[in-house]
Amino acid sequence: MAVTVETLEKLERKITLSLPLNSIQSEVENRLKQVARTVKMDGFRPGKVPMSVVAQRYGYSVQYEVLNDKVGEAFAQAVNEAKLRVAGQPRISEKEGAPEGEAQFEAIFEVMPEVKIGDLTSAEVEKLTAEVDDAAIDKTVDILRKQRRTFAQRAQADVAVDGDRVTVDFEGKIDGETFSGGKAEDFQFLVGEGQMLKEFEDAVRGMKAGESKTFPLAFPADYHGKDVAGKTADFLVTVKKIEAANLPEVDEAFAKALGVAEGTVEGLRADIKKNLEREVKFRVQGRNKQAVMDALVSKAELELPKASVQAEVARLLEGARAELQQRGIKDAEKAEIPEDVFLPQAERRVRLGLVVAELVRANELHATPDQIKAHVEELAASYEKPEDVARWYFGDRQRLAEVEAVVIENNVTEFVLGKAKVSDKAVSFDELMGQA
C-alpha cells in the first residue's frame, strides 16, 4: 500500500486510508453468517434464522464492527510502512468524495518527537552523601524506648510537664457556640509532642490534676477543620489525670525484646546502624536521582505530543479523585477539579519519560536480570523472612516491572553522574531525613 503522510503542524500528521467496498461487504456477509449459526430468535430454530432477518437485526452493528477493524488494520499497516511511531490514539473520520468502489478515511494523529538529549558533560549535578553516626543511632534508640514506655500516675501536687500523658475534659466555643470536634471527655495526649495545637499544650503544661482553666485558642488559617480555620475559640479544660513516662533501660532485656539474636546492646546498635544505612542509601539514591532527572530535563530539546500530555493529565486527575474518595470526600468523582492545575506536572512527566526512554535506548541502559534480582534481594533484606518477600516480587509481573523501572532509573542516574560536572555535598543524617 502506497502511503502518503501529510504534516499538519509540528508533531501532527494526516494519512488517507482507502478501503475496497467489496472487501468490507464480503467481511460483513461472512460475519453475519457466523451470527446466523448461533443466534436465537423467537419463531425460528437455532441456525435456521433467514439471513435477511439476521441482517435486519444485526447488520448495522456488524458493519460498524467491520469498519472499525478494517480501518484499524489499514492504519496500523500504513504507519508501519511509513515507519512512524504514533503518540496516542488517532482521530479518524470518513472522507467524502471517495473514488467509486472505495471508502476513504482520514486519520489525524501525532508522532513521537525527536529527542535531543543535549550535552551532558556541561550539566551540573549536586551529588549528596550521608553517613550514619552515633547521634543517629542514639536518636533511634530513644524512639524505640518511647515506643515501649509505660506510664505511672503522678502525685496530686505534681504539675504536667513535657513527656507526661494527661487525661482531660475540654470544650471549645466560637461566638458562644460549641463546634464540631470542640468537645471531649477523658481525652488523652502527650504534652510537648505536638499532638495538640501549641496554645492548647501551653495551657495544660503546668496544671495539676483537678484544675480547670479557660484560655483563647486561635486556629491557623490552614487548619484542616475548615469550619474553624482562622477563627478564635474560647476553651475550658479540666485536667483529670497526669501520668509520668517511664522509659525502659537500654540493656540486654531491651535488646532481646526487640528481637536482637545475641541479645546484647552492641548487637542492637549494630542492627540499628545496618537498617539506618539501608534507609540512608535509598534516600541518597532518591535525592541524587531527582537531581539527575532535573539536569536531563533542563538539557533536552523536544516537542511534547499533546495526546500524551492530555493522557497524563487524565491519569493525574483520576488519582486526585481517588485520593479525595479515600479521605471520605462526598461525591469526589463529581468534584470540579480544573485540569490545568495538573498541566505543568503532566508536561514534566511526559518530557522526562521521553528523555529517559531515549537515553536508555541510545546507551543500552536496560535493566539486566542480574540487576533486577539484586534489587529484589536488597528490598527483601529488611524483612524478617526475605525469601518469602523475594518470592512475592518474582511471583507477579507487575511488581517485577516496577522493580525493573527503578533499576533503569538507577542505571540512568549512574550514567549521567559519570558524564556530568558533579559536586559532592555531605549532609547530616537529620538533614537527609528532613528532621533538621
Curated annotation (Swiss-Prot):
Residues 163-248 form the PPIase FKBP-type domain. InterPro entries: PPIase_dom_sf, PPIase_FKBP_dom, Trig_fac, Trigger_fac_C, Trigger_fac_C_sf, Trigger_fac_ribosome-bd_bac, Trigger_fac_ribosome-bd_sf, Trigger_fact/SurA_dom_sf. It catalyses: [protein]-peptidylproline (omega=180) = [protein]-peptidylproline (omega=0). Keywords: Cell cycle, Cell division, Chaperone, Cytoplasm, Isomerase, Rotamase. It comes from Delftia acidovorans (strain DSM 14801 / SPH-1). HAMAP family: Trigger_factor_Tig (MF_00303). It comes from the Bacteria. This is Trigger factor. It is found in: Cytoplasm. The gene is tig. The keyword Isomerase applies. Involved in protein export. Acts as a chaperone by maintaining the newly synthesized protein in an open conformation. Functions as a peptidyl-prolyl cis-trans isomerase. One of its GO terms (biological process) is cell division. GO terms for cellular component: cytoplasm. One of its GO terms (molecular function) is peptidyl-prolyl cis-trans isomerase activity. Consists of 3 domains; the N-terminus binds the ribosome, the middle domain has PPIase activity, while the C-terminus has intrinsic chaperone activity on its own. Belongs to the FKBP-type PPIase family. Tig subfamily. Pfam families: FKBP_C, Trigger_C, Trigger_N. Its EC number is 5.2.1.8. Gene3D superfamilies: 3.10.50.40, Trigger factor ribosome-binding domain, Trigger factor, C-terminal domain.
